[in-house]
């Protein structure tokens, strides 16, 4: 059964396949040298860096906040990723929310995003984030349904972003 886990090297091959899929938009990977990450040692360093982002003192770009990065995996298969931002900047409050997630294209339309968000809520409780702000694009009907299935209550729309508050408890 698929589960949210901290980033792990055991899905190296599948992760590389996922980011190479047509229609996958890994904006979160824009600054990554994907060719370099084919090397297991380099990938292990990347994984360690992902894990470290949950700490307050980890190096990160200006304006970024500590975040717990989780990968949704089934055995050695990478299905998607989810990030929990530990606090909100003004931009995150207005547009980005506490949680961001995506599912690799070949795994979409199987309920994975719904399950990912459901499994993320206990992590949010441990981080004392309750309620959880989750946003989606105005035209992203699938994501809107995911958020509403998780109990999200619509707050408002800001410049094309729908904002929902999801109870973590």
Predicted segments, located by residue:
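Conserved GNAT acetyl-CoA-binding A-motif
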Residues: 124-135
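Conserved active-site alpha-helix within GNAT-family acetyltransferase domains
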Residues: 114, 138-156
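Conserved acetyl-CoA pyrophosphate-binding loop and the N-cap/start of the following alpha-helix
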Residues: 107, 111-119
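GNAT-family acyltransferases
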Residues: 1-98, 102-105, 155-169
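Active-site acidic-Proline motif in GNAT/NAT acetyltransferases
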Residues: 101-110, 139
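Short glycine-rich hinge loops at helix-strand junctions in the catalytic core
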Residues: 111, 128, 151
């Amino acid at each position: 059964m698929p589960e949210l886990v901290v980033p792990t090297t055991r899905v190296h091959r599948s992760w590389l396949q996922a980011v190479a899929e047509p229609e996958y938009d890994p904006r979160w990977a824009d600054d990554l040298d994907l060719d370099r990450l084919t090397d297991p040692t380099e990938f292990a360093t990347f994984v360690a860096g992902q894990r470290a982002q949950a700490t307050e003192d980890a190096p990160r770009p200006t304006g970024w906040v500590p975040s717990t990065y989780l990968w949704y995996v089934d055995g050695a298969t990478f299905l998607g990723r989810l990030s929990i931002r530990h606090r909100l900047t003004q931009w995150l409050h207005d547009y980005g929310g506490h949680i961001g997630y995506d599912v690799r294209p070949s795994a979409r339309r199987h309920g994975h995003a719904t399950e990912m968000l459901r499994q993320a809520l206990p992590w949010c409780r441990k981080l004392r984030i309750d309620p959880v702000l989750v946003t989606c694009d105005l035209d992203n009907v699938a994501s809107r349904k995911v958020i509403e299935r998780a109990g999200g209550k619509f707050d408002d729309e800001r410049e094309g972003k729908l904002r929902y508050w999801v109870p973590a408890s």
